[in-house]
């Protein structure tokens, strides 16, 4: 569970006190992407629900705080999404498992919370977990229960089952009396959480639970023959030094020969596995691709898969606590991820809501076998409205051209850029890999003249570019003549407002540019820019809060600030409508 706890006041009349505290605190410490932790306090009531930066087609409740996506699954004709939710305010606290259902992953109906503190084994909290479909099409939820108050927060692993299996909405859930399934971890009771979807192999059900010891990230493996009595394996399935607490682990098979997803219990020759962990100390995630030894219950990353902080990420931006599930209807694996706010806590209280789930993504193994690729689920295309098509638009150095005819504040933009030569690619310094993203994108940003790039999109831009969020590429050549593509999403000019967290996000990616083309798709939605770049291999999500580039005053441009001319071969853009139902 992505735990972000903050100030607690009992009524709206305390807002003035909170404002004073926030002013002092933010001026001393600044604002960060995950918000600060105040262990002595629990919740704040929302003052109002403000809409100016509210998303139009991303998943979010009508009001209040959300964080981790939990237990996604498909059951009796409906997709289910549970999520960590504060029903009493727009900051972390009072967490329950909220529950929504959908026929298409786009339109959502909110139901009553499915799981909330009510038993001794979860009386202090119901934190993140997963769903598993047992034989006979019977769903079960595994989740972390908190059995002691702050500061200990001792954690156990529980399960819940539907009260009525014939109800496709699964409105009511029961917590059997034989909980907890797994008791408090004696070595680190406050860092033992977020059970995975279980898989069946060798006569046993198996699941992972995230943990840490002496700053070593750990994924413990548990086995059960009946899903009721669980025993820990003598050794973790995998560990890694200097990575800290592993939150929200995810472990699943991928096919080396097909884009189709696989059920978690699917095993076979050639099948690889993905282990993803969310790093509590950095608020980023990384994943490895490797081999699962089913007999010894070991996972070994491939030698081409970096294991640790420098590992591959699903998303190099504002993306955390992700969870995948197998969709048996369309035979695909779908990825959910949470994007926190990048404004201040006082902003969240004033607007009355915080947090979104990013657009669900289909995810599969690249043919190289070295990384995953992702794409928005096809259902999102049903929201497309008015459209514009740009063809063969040349961009010389310093040129930006507006993309008109769509609502730029709420759009889907899919572009292919090309260039005639790679000769102007600048030399790549290997040390850049280790630099902070802000430093890389500052020194090689959208306004800094280069050779091959920077070029890309200026999203959520004001007419005269006082505000804009650039998403762009810059191409380098390493000593071995291999190309390195830098992709950035840079929020530092996204808003004239002060007191915001305006990070630069970046990712370097190896991509085949033999055809001298590179792709970029951005889903733009008022305060979020989700970008899929470099042939679906590099993804960056940003939260931004423009003051001028809002509603009909938002603009979209293509640009080039490199000496090598760029051509927009194809650009297809659509205004995006809102779903007919959103919680």
Swiss-Prot record:
GO terms for molecular function: beta-fructofuranosidase activity. Belongs to the glycosyl hydrolase 32 family. InterPro entries: ConA-like_dom_sf, Fructan_Metab_Enzymes, Glyco_hydro_32, Glyco_hydro_32_AS, Glyco_hydro_32_C, Glyco_hydro_32_N, Glyco_hydro_beta-prop_sf. Disulfide bonds: none annotated. It is found in: Secreted, Cell wall. Its main location: secreted. Pfam families: Glyco_hydro_32C, Glyco_hydro_32N. Residues 1-33 form the signal peptide. It comes from the Eukaryota. It catalyses: Hydrolysis of terminal non-reducing beta-D-fructofuranoside residues in beta-D-fructofuranosides. This is Beta-fructofuranosidase, insoluble isoenzyme 3. It is an enzyme of class 3 (hydrolase). The keyword Secreted applies. Keywords: Cell wall, Glycoprotein, Glycosidase, Hydrolase, Secreted, Signal, Zymogen.
């Amino acid at each position: 569970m992505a735990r972000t706890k903050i100030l607690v006041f009992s009524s709206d009349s305390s807002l003035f006190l909170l404002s004073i505290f926030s002013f002092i605190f933010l001026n001393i410490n600044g604002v960060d992407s995950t918000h600060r932790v105040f262990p002595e306090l629990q919740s704040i009531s929302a003052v109002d629900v403000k809409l100016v930066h509210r998303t139009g087609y991303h998943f979010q409740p009508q009001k209040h705080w959300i964080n981790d996506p939990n237990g996604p699954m498909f059951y009796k004709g409906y997709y289910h999404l549970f999520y960590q939710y504060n029903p009493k305010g727009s900051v972390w606290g009072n967490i329950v498992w909220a529950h929504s259902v959908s026929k298409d992953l786009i339109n959502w109906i909110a139901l009553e919370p499915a799981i909330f503190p009510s038993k001794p084994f979860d009386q202090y909290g119901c934190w993140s977990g997963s769903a598993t479909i047992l034989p006979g099409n019977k769903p079960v939820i595994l989740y972390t229960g908190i059995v002691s108050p702050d500061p200990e927060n001792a954690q156990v692993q529980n399960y819940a089952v539907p009260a009525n299996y014939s109800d496709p909405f699964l409105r009511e859930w029961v917590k059997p009396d034989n909980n907890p399934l797994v008791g408090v971890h004696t070595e680190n009771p406050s860092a033992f959480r977020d059970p995975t979807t279980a898989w069946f192999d060798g006569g046993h059900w198996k699941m992972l639970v995230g943990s840490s010891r002496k700053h070593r990230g750990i994924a413990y493996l548990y086995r059960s023959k009946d899903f009721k009595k669980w025993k820990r394996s003598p050794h973790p399935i995998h560990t890694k030094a200097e990575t800290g607490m592993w939150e929200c682990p995810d472990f699943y098979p991928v096919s080396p020969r097909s884009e189709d997803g696989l059920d978690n219990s699917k095993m076979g020759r050639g099948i690889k596995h993905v282990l993803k962990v969310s790093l509590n100390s950095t608020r980023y995630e990384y994943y490895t691709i490797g081999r699962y030894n089913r007999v010894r219950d070991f996972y070994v990353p491939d030698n081409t898969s970096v294991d640790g902080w420098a590992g591959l990420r699903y998303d190099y931006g504002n993306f955390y606590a992700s969870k995948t599930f197998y969709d048996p209807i369309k035979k695909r694996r779908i990825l959910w991820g949470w994007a926190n706010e990048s404004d201040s806590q006082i902003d969240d209280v004033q607007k009355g809501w915080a947090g979104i789930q990013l657009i669900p993504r289909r995810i599969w193994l690249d043919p190289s076998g070295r990384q995953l690729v992702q794409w928005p689920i096809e259902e999102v295309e049903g929201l497309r409205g008015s459209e514009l098509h740009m063809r063969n638009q040349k961009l010389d150095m310093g040129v930006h051209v507006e993309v008109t005819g769509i609502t730029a504040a709420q759009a889907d933009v899919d572009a292919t850029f090309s260039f005639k030569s790679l000769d102007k690619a600048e030399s790549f310094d290997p040390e850049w890999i280790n630099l902070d993203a802000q430093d890389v994108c500052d020194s090689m940003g959208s306004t800094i003249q280069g050779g091959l790039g920077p070029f890309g999109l200026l999203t959520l831009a004001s007419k005269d570019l006082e505000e804009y969020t650039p998403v762009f590429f810059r191409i380098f050549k390493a000593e071995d003549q291999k190309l390195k593509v830098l992709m950035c999403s840079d929020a530092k000019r996204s808003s004239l407002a002060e007191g915001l967290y305006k990070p630069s996000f970046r990712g370097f990616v190896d991509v085949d540019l033999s055809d001298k083309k590179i792709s970029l798709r951005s889903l733009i939605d008022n305060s979020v820019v989700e970008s899929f770049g470099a042939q679906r291999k590099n993804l960056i999500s940003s939260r931004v809060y423009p003051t001028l580039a809002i509603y009909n005053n938002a603009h979209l441009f293509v640009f080039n600030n490199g000496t090598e001319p760029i051509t927009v071969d194809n650009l297809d853009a659509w205004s995006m409508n809102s779903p007919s139902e959103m919680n």
